[in-house]
């Protein structure tokens, strides 16, 4: 508990230092939307970032996506994410997102520099920052927190006694709280993840409906909360023979998975293509949100000074 108190004091003081100008922060000429969380572990940020980028493009904006690039080993920043970028270079989540969105994207641990690159070199008129809620060195205009419906804020304690990076009071200071799952509370917005057809890793033109899986299969996941993937499969009547769980951002090797039918997440698939078995499949998911959430987001964006 003393360590938790210390963590709280440090996080509180750090945010205060940026908000008061004691520590410098970067302000770019385009509005910045932060999509983050106050807890560790997977909460569903990536599908929301993809959805926001597609939605804003459809509404006439020129979005750019900024990521930390966790798990990548690039040393040349800001690093543009292209169709040829590798997970080992820029991280698995940026590669996944680049497959889904058609807008500029860069990774940079210095988020202010990355945001400036998107504005100045790619002419973006809105920046979507994947994670970075606690990275106050980049000024933001709209903050969106994503929470897992089942785990929510856990035991409500900060690290290391609990899962929180910031106190639950922070939820009252952000613009939107999006709950991935169900059972939203007052003031929260529901996000559901809708799976499409399975896609073959070796031949992406091959698709397979979940309803066509008659025999039990192996499921594998190296994400922040693997159980959410397994539960998603079970909700769609997929019979699981076994579940292989790995740490988030796991660097897969051929020996990690059996040479038989395996279902995995889209995030894991980008790291397994080079050695994929013919019967390995990934499941794309799309974020669904209330149209009222989208309209309120547009209204806030238009009111950014």
Curated annotation (Swiss-Prot):
Summarize where ATP binds, as residue positions.
Answer: 39-46
Q: Name one GO biological process term.
A: lipopolysaccharide core region biosynthetic process
Alphabetical keyword list: ATP-binding, Kinase, Lipid A biosynthesis, Lipid biosynthesis, Lipid metabolism, Nucleotide-binding, Transferase
GO MF terms, alphabetically ordered: ATP binding; tetraacyldisaccharide 4'-kinase activity
Which pathway? Glycolipid biosynthesis; lipid IV(A) biosynthesis; lipid IV(A) from (3R)-3-hydroxytetradecanoyl-[acyl-carrier-protein] and UDP-N-acetyl-alpha-D-glucosamine: step 6/6
Q: Which domain of life is it from?
A: Bacteria
**Catalytic activity annotation:** a lipid A disaccharide + ATP = a lipid IVA + ADP + H(+)
Does the keyword Lipid metabolism belong to this entry?
yes
- Per the record, what is one GO cellular component? plasma membrane
What's the Enzyme Commission number for this chain? 2.7.1.130
Q: Please describe what this protein does.
A: Transfers the gamma-phosphate of ATP to the 4'-position of a tetraacyldisaccharide 1-phosphate intermediate (termed DS-1-P) to form tetraacyldisaccharide 1,4'-bis-phosphate (lipid IVA).
PANTHER family (UniProt xref) = TETRAACYLDISACCHARIDE 4'-KINASE, TETRAACYLDISACCHARIDE 4'-KINASE, MITOCHONDRIAL-RELATED
Q: Record's family?
A: Belongs to the LpxK family.
Quote the protein name from its UniProt record: Tetraacyldisaccharide 4'-kinase
Q: Which organism is it from?
A: Pseudoalteromonas atlantica (strain T6c / ATCC BAA-1087)
Top-down, what is the taxonomic lineage of the species of origin?
Bacteria, Pseudomonadati, Pseudomonadota, Gammaproteobacteria, Alteromonadales
């Amino acid at each position: 508990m003393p360590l938790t108190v210390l963590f709280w004091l440090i996080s509180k003081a750090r945010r205060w230092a940026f908000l008061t100008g004691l520590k410098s922060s970067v302000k770019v000429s385009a509005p910045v939307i932060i999509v983050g969380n106050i807890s560790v572990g997977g909460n569903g940020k990536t599908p929301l970032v993809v959805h926001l980028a597609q939605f804003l493009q459809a509404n006439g904006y020129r979005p750019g996506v900024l990521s930390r690039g966790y798990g990548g080993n690039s040393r040349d920043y800001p690093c543009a994410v292209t169709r040829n970028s590798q997970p080992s270079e820029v991280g698995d989540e940026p590669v996944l997102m680049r497959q889904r969105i058609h807008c500029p994207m860069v990774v940079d641990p210095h988020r202010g520099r990355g945001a400036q690159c998107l504005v100045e070199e790619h002419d973006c008129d809105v920046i979507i920052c994947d994670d970075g809620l606690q990275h106050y060195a980049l000024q933001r205009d709209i903050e969106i927190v994503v929470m897992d419906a089942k785990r929510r804020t856990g035991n409500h304690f900060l690290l290391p006694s609990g899962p929180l990076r910031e106190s639950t009071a922070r939820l009252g200071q952000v613009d939107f709280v999006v709950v991935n799952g169900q059972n939203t509370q007052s003031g929260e917005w529901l996000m559901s993840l809708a799976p499409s057809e399975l896609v073959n890793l070796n031949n992406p033109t091959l698709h397979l409906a979940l309803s066509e899986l008659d025999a039990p299969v192996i499921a594998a996941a190296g994400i922040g909360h693997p159980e959410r993937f397994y539960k998603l499969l079970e909700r769609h009547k997929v019979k699981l023979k076994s579940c292989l769980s790995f740490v988030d951002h796991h660097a897969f090797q051929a020996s990690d998975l059996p040479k038989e039918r395996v279902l995995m997440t889209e995030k894991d698939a980008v790291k397994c293509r080079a050695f994929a078995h013919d019967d390995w499949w990934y499941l794309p998911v799309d974020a669904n949100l209330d149209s009222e959430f989208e309209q309120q987001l547009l209204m806030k964006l238009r009111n950014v000074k």
